[in-house]
């Protein structure tokens, strides 16, 4: 089985070290270096999101993890938007201590941070960005399976 790679717009492999470098840069620019201790992982091609923030509880506290879609060719501005989006979730959870903020965590507090970044830095962070999946595996939804089963009877 070939090793799957996540590529940037130039066709160069994107690594977790690249994500860490950008995280550190955006943390300094947009979050006053308040975020730390984040791990990175690649989302499965079966996953339906481009990014995911997880706050994993441990005996020593919360461990933050940011997942990035593997089946996307990342141009720099889209990768920045995705990482900052997930960093907002991290900020709300770790710094503000808020585990819940509306549906999928993109509620009032999330939108307030998006507005702050737009007003102060001209940065547009979308709640549901579309960065273009490649080789997306499409699986039938449950109702489609039931319908097909009924038709075959």
Name each model feature, range by range.
Residues 2-77, 94-153:
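Metalloprotease/metallohydrolase-associated module, dominated by Zn2+-dependent proteases
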Residues 81-94:
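Active-site recognition of the HExxH zinc-binding catalytic motif
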């Amino acid at each position: 089985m070939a090793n799957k790679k996540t590529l940037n717009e130039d066709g160069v492999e994107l690594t977790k070290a690249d994500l860490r470098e950008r995280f550190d840069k955006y943390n300094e620019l947009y979050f006053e270096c308040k975020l730390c201790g984040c791990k990175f992982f690649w989302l499965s091609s079966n996953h339906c999101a481009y990014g995911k923030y997880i706050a994993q509880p441990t005996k020593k506290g919360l461990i933050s993890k940011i997942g990035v879609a593997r089946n996307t060719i990342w141009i720099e501005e889209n990768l920045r938007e995705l990482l900052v989006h997930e960093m907002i979730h991290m900020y709300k959870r770790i710094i503000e201590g808020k585990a819940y903020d509306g549906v999928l965590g993109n509620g009032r507090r999330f939108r307030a941070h998006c507005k702050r970044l737009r007003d102060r830095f001209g940065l547009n962070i979308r709640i549901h960005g579309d960065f273009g999946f490649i080789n997306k595996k499409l699986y039938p939804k449950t109702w489609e399976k039931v319908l097909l089963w009924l038709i075959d009877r």
